[in-house]
Amino acid sequence: MYADAPSDSAPPEAVLPMDEAAMRAVDRATAALRRGEAVAIETADGSVGAAVSVESVAIDAVQRLVQLTGAAPVLAVTRRRATVLKLMGEGTGVVALSLPRCLTADEAHALADPEHRPDGDMPDGLTATAMDPGSRETAAVDLARLARLLPAAIVAPATDHTGSAAEWAAEHDLLLVRARDIADYRVHVVRTLRRVAEARVPLSGAENTSIAAFRPIDGGPEHLAIIVGNPVAGEPVLARLHSECFTGDLLAGLRCDCGQQLRGAIAEIARHGSGVLLYLAQEGRGIGLVNKLRAYRIQDRGFDTVDANEILGFEADERVYLPAAEMLRQLGFTAVRLMTNNPEKLRQLARCGIEVVERVPHIFPANGHNEGYLRTKAERSGHMF
């Protein structure tokens, strides 16, 4: 039993409630970043500044930020990316990179882009400063993460205003979002998950199956519950948490074991008679399909799957399982027999109030293309094969 499994993250109940307007502001800000627009970010002390994502930044964006704020911008990257660039030691959080002169868009791209080699030339005078969790720089990187972009942003404080953050943002026609709302967003969105549709969908080998779709209030990606048979609410249910994998699930790609795990889990649940598979919108261990393809390209240079994520600036695994716990509760289950090899799933579910009464191993043979991937999961991520 794993009820007391540790976790480094705060429990969901430790986060103060967020109103719908704040959630909408974060959602709109992620969309603006994806379009290459600047957004205004307000920190807890009431100060404000502007940020734009590195991935979608235009050549003239740095100069526009200078004109908007009256300050020289910095490049905000994750500590993982700064470590890859040999600018800081191992750690977590966000780092601000700055120059004695104004950083250029090309320099920002070179420092944040996954194709930039760790041993490449650094601009003269480049300095790296670790930022506080509540900083504008940290919020900007978190916002880029939410937008499924590279976790890097060009950020500058506003030095040309004396009014409120809202007044400054309105004056410059920028969307305004608070740093604390960005930090808490993922927890709050989970609380708004609602079952929006359900239908009977007979599957090959599991004809008595229905699929329920859960959608958050921000209109974000839906998570699916594939319910096989008639599991009894209130009793421990045979369950599998499966993060979507376009290449493995749909295309039968051989670089991972996801397709085997998906189809194998449904077959095992059908043999058992009943259970639920949660199909979670967390492509690429939470970094999104585009970034997963970037990670594959990096792996082709000889790096493993963990190194590839870190070269991109991500953690080895960016997934959270709050949505899974919420879906299980809404389906009537607070205890599971969990089909997994991943100890982090056990820890996170327990942290979210779901009792794991048994771990059911879920192992499939290597195919010749994914041997290194499976070995890395065991040796570096602690998977139990």
From Swiss-Prot:
The active site is at residues 317, 319. One of its GO terms (cellular component) is cytosol. Its EC number is 3.5.4.25. The keyword Nucleotide-binding applies. GTP binds at residues 240-244, 261, 283-285, 305, 340, 345. Zn(2+) binds at residues 245, 256, 258. Residues 190-385 are annotated as: GTP cyclohydrolase II. Binds 1 zinc ion per subunit. One of its GO terms (molecular function) is 3,4-dihydroxy-2-butanone-4-phosphate synthase activity. Keywords: GTP-binding, Hydrolase, Metal-binding, Nucleotide-binding, Riboflavin biosynthesis, Zinc. InterPro entries: DHBP_synth_RibB-like_a/b_dom, GTP_cyclohydro_II, RibA, RibA-like_sf. Pathway: Cofactor biosynthesis; riboflavin biosynthesis; 5-amino-6-(D-ribitylamino)uracil from GTP: step 1/4. GO terms for biological process: riboflavin biosynthetic process. Coiled coil: none annotated. PANTHER family: 3,4-DIHYDROXY-2-BUTANONE 4-PHOSPHATE SYNTHASE (PTHR21327:SF18), GTP CYCLOHYDROLASE II-RELATED (PTHR21327). Catalyzes the conversion of GTP to 2,5-diamino-6-ribosylamino-4(3H)-pyrimidinone 5'-phosphate (DARP), formate and pyrophosphate. In the N-terminal section; belongs to the DHBP synthase family. In the C-terminal section; belongs to the GTP cyclohydrolase II family. HAMAP family: RibA. This is GTP cyclohydrolase-2. It comes from Azospirillum brasilense.
